[in-house]
């Protein structure tokens, strides 16, 4: 919200400086972003009257004028502006004046004619207004008055960054209320008297969606002069709030928007067929907006229509077909309350953002419409003339918001603020904020005013009391709190432990968006319908993610495009799975995922720069799983996944249940994502790996361990893990470990076969094993794998 300090002080004028005022506003929770002067630095400029204006004898584009600036003699000034003419009131820089840029005005001759000053344009005085030629002031502008005083240019614009909950401050009225409360100062509102109707013309109004539009006011004003010029005082107020002047009708509705906080709209009455109908749009209905763009409407969009077509997207943007033009004679003024829930998000869905939608989305004072209509009518008649008809009002009282009644406990107030504020001060603060307050045994009950949609819970009242009392007035003190020991179960694996492990192995933690591009997600997780957001941040972030892999792959691409080819990332986060039986129809499951790409190690003269492969990531995943202290509980089983290479992917299985996947990204997916080179990923359900077996202390065997190596030949399709597991199944009490240490394919091994070398460790806790014990265990293992897999011992 950008506003002029001088305009604010017309409503409330506390005895504080500009710096003190902006500090007050900031400390009250309305952060001031910027304070800027409304015009450049200049002096010596006066209001003048062009008494004579004639053609320069030697220059076609110059005019010779005599200007009255309230001195004894008229000033001779040569001017080149096309709009310079006799009778004009102008801004005159007299001799000795200094304009922005340290430009000094001196006596001069232009093509032989004396010039003792300069007639100024807005730009020449450092005023940001688009205009051709010199300024044209009001005919009643006092001659000789200092121009800075005439336009009140000793003023600043204050830009406040309002939070979304403080919609009540999107106006001079709202800011004045706030400043008045902070300074215990009275707020003087402009007098708004009802405008008496002079004609009986009305337009029929029907509201078919009362929940979305509980109140709609319409008023016909005929014989309006849209060619009238917006007064300079209004243009200046609009300019200082960041709005340029367009035409008097639009300027008036914008003025009421800024002053009162009530968005309004004006229709060309001649372009309305039949009457006004406020309804929901038909799916696919089209409307051409005032900016010339065409919008295809959704069925949940509220529109203001006539009997044949949509005239405007309600509360957001007017339509071109019904807009006021230079040919307009009669207008229909609209002033309505549109429910925030029915406006919120609609503008964004059409790529629009307007001052009107910003206010309606957050909530407009629902008691403001009548006075705003009268204010706009009075200004329209004053500036453009016209004949006024009665106001037609359609209201659904049952659908209007009800004031929130909120209880505030004394104990809660003291606990949250950490300071005791006297009861009388609490009541005074709440009443100054426009609330009705009732004292109870436990504290108070406050009824929020109609302009405060954000007062809903007890903490809201605590915040209001605290910020108006002044955070600076609350003494500093150390927080007092009871320390509670965290309940930590030894069987739980803390997430921090896994994070530390991966960081120690060279990974960086990533945090990606939970919102993803839906079509891209279908490449990674085909066949599963994701939740599509009704009001997404953008089209590229319109679906809830079904897993973490998509976000990590996009992060790899982002890094590779910035000359960072070696990437090791992991992420912990939620995936969102639609489920009819889950709460709110959605399962939120914590997941752990990781990705590697590029070289195995950083570039070094003494290290080979080999590219990462499947087994690099498999080793990292095994390190995570080994935190469970039960290496026999998990396994990797060859499996296919639509996002992974069919020959380089596996399911991660724990206790017989598939809990994740690991593998190299499918070449086709690699191409579509724009990945540069081999990329390997994993994803695991966190809830399946965050528990561990509590280790038990056992005595170490004092007897020697024995190692026997066997090499078995099996089909290439047989997984080595299955062979190792088979060894453990029949190894008996003496077999302590079976480890694969070599895989060989080539000379001496039949084509289509492979040789697996396995180290068997045998040991007894009670005695030294005899050769017969060892041989018996080895023979049993060989026989079992031979029978189960058709394996044979390699010669």
Swiss-Prot record:
Boundaries of every B5 domain copy:
401-476
Write out the GO biological process terms: phenylalanyl-tRNA aminoacylation
Coiled-coil boundaries: none
Q: Which UniProt keywords apply?
A: Aminoacyl-tRNA synthetase, ATP-binding, Cytoplasm, Ligase, Magnesium, Metal-binding, Nucleotide-binding, Protein biosynthesis, RNA-binding, tRNA-binding
Q: Where does Mg(2+) bind?
A: 454, 460, 463-464
Which compartments is it annotated to reside in?
Answer: Cytoplasm
Provide the top EC class: ligase
Q: Please name the GO terms that the record assigns under molecular function.
A: ATP binding; magnesium ion binding; phenylalanine-tRNA ligase activity; tRNA binding
Q: What is this protein called?
A: Phenylalanine--tRNA ligase beta subunit
Gene name of the record: pheT
